[in-house]
């Protein structure tokens, strides 16, 4: 059983408010053909569990096939552009992440407008960050890690899943609030970054739990702290570890092409809310270290505005530029 908290109550209020309107106004024929979920990352990544879960549940609810279409590359721009060019009829969904608000802050010539070419439907997941190190790192706490990093300026290499990705920005926020100067080693995807961390070629990563929890449990990696991650019992939060200013998370959410009718958006949001607030869904995702974070269109839009400022401030101070 999951206790009723403010997030659950807010989600229930949201659903109660939009369900009658959505059912009354959404076109009766929608959906009238297969639905495609575009995922801007390779198969097996942290977005796959929720993509396939909601795909299965939408098929059960609506009787239409749902195709998960992984289109990795271009720092998520390939899948995002494909979504922007799709008919605005609710049959193409973009399962996106924090990168959606980060890319415009780093890339001057995006082939789409992240704000004007899309409409928000719902947030689904929030993924907290954990500071994870190779066992050879002589630090068992965040404060010991900070002291070590300060004693060897640029001497601790940290991995990221790509230049300008959310975990790169998370590491730079850590540098800013801890006063450290770690050296960035970007990879083309989280899988290779974790493999090199396992081999000791890099010493640290700021990762969502999905990709590292099995290695932490096996003792191949060590977690020093997290921002509130499910699935890491016994590991302190950054606040408990004496670094409350390190507060950042990534998210996964559904967007649709601009021009999609509001009744279609409401019908989608209503069904997604039912799926994400189902205790069975929450249990399945918690097992992967992911926490349900359902918000409807308006709350999602407000959150993106706040994140644009927060990520923008970190990027500006760190002077992060696309290479």
Q: Where do the model's predicted regions map?
A:
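Hinge/capping helix and adjacent helix->loop/strand transition within the periplasmic-binding protein
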Residues: 85-91, 105-192, 238, 251-284
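An extracytoplasmic/periplasmic, membrane-proximal ligand-sensing/linker region
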Residues: 32-34, 177-180, 217, 240, ...
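Beta->alpha turn/N-cap motifs
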Residues: 95-100, 160, 170, 190, ...
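N-terminal secretory signal peptides and thylakoid transit peptides that target proteins
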Residues: 1-13
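N-terminal signal peptide c-region/cleavage motif recognized by signal peptidases
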Residues: 19-21
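C-terminal lobe and pocket-closing loops
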Residues: 126, 212-277, 306-309
């Amino acid at each position: 059983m999951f206790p009723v908290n403010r997030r659950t109550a807010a989600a229930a209020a949201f659903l109660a408010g939009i369900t009658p309107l959505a059912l009354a106004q959404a076109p009766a024929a929608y959906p009238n053909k297969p639905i495609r979920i575009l995922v801007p990352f390779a198969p097996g990544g942290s977005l796959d569990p929720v993509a396939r879960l909601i795909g299965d549940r939408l098929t059960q609810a609506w009787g239409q096939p749902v195709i998960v279409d992984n289109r990795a590359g271009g720092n998520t721009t390939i899948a995002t552009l494909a979504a922007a060019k799709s008919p605005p009829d609710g049959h193409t969904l973009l399962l996106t992440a924090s990168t959606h608000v980060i890319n415009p802050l780093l890339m001057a010539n995006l082939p789409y407008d992240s704000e004007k070419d899309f409409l928000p439907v719902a947030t689904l997941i929030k993924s907290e960050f954990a500071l994870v190190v190779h066992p050879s790192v002589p630090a068992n706490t965040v404060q010991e890690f900070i002291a070590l990093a300060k004693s060897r300026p640029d001497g601790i290499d940290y991995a990221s899943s790509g230049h300008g990705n959310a975990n790169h920005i998370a590491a730079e926020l850590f540098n800013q609030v801890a006063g450290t100067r770690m050296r960035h080693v970007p990879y083309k995807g989280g899988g290779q970054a974790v493999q090199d961390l396992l081999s000791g070629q890099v010493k640290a990563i700021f990762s969502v739990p999905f990709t590292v929890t099995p290695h932490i449990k096996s003792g191949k990696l060590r977690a020093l702290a997290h921002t509130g991650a499910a699935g890491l019992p016994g590991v302190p939060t950054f606040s408990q570890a004496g670094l409350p200013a390190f507060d950042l998370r990534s998210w996964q959410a559904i967007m649709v092409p601009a021009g999609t009718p509001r009744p279609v958006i409401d019908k989608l949001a209503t069904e997604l809310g039912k799926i994400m607030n189902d205790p069975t869904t929450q249990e399945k995702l918690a097992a992967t270290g992911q926490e349900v974070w359902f918000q409807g269109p308006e709350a999602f839009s407000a959150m993106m505005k706040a994140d644009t400022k927060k990520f923008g401030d970190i990027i500006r101070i760190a002077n992060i530029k696309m290479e």
